[in-house]
Amino acid sequence: LIPIEVNIMKIKAVVFDAYGTLFDVYSIQVLAEAFYPGNGADIAAKWRDKQIEYTRLITQSDPHNATGSRFFRPFWELTRLSLEYTLDRLALDRKSGQVEKLMQQYAHLTPFPENLAVLQQIKAMGLTTAILSNGSVEMLTSAVKSAGMADVLDHLLSVDPIRLFKTSPESYGLVQQNMAVNKDEVLFVSSNGWDVLGATWFGFTTHWVNRQGLPFEALSPQPHFSGPDLHSVLHSLGTISNPPIPNQI
């Protein structure tokens, strides 16, 4: 654990990122490989990178508009455009039927296996649970229902109302706007280093789910907590007594 002073006993809500944290964005490569043999992993990686690049471009190009970025497009639309670009970049045929099937698969991404048990334990502690995501409410609702997690998540928060994506301060501010909590009462959980940085800068206590065993970003600050999967969130909350997880920061 990083020796940053934080009172974990003040935590009232645990807020999760969705894509990459609760849902495996790279699970799409199985279907992509079936459609485009030898290209599945490359499609999944480039698709995800372009998707995030588009969100940053939109937010950074018009960050001070009171009604959100005038360039804003819903995450679902950006996901489709990112897929189309990826296929074009790899010189692969954009057959409409295959694009539609990949998009539908994205709406029902594979959840990580520990999700439900961990969320149930967090709820049993009396804590509020939520998702904060670039995804639309419709996307999140579909993914959560298909994963059987609707009963263990109290809030599904989308950036759509503010028309600014993460890591804008306004995106993290949605937590306080929609939940009766202060910044220091929130544990924010994400597998994306850039998301953890944004949330830490905003003032949340943060937990980085380091599923790939990577070094954290060179840019500071470091996350308050880290571990290899969602079970480590329980460790951070003090609900289990285990020795330090080997690949914690």
Predicted regions and their residues:
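Short, Lys/Arg-enriched N-terminal segments with co-localized hydrophobic residues
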Residues: 1-8
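A short acidic, helix-capping loop that chelates divalent metal ions and anchors anionic groups
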Residues: 31, 54-60, 139-141, 215-218
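Alpha-helical elements of Rossmann-like donor-binding domains used by nucleotide-donor carbohydrate transfer enzymes
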Residues: 30-31, 46, 81-85, 101, ...
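Active-site neighborhood of HAD-like aspartate-dependent phosphohydrolases
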Residues: 9-52
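Asp-based, Mg2+/Mn2+-dependent phosphohydrolase catalytic module
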Residues: 9-14, 120, 132, 136-249
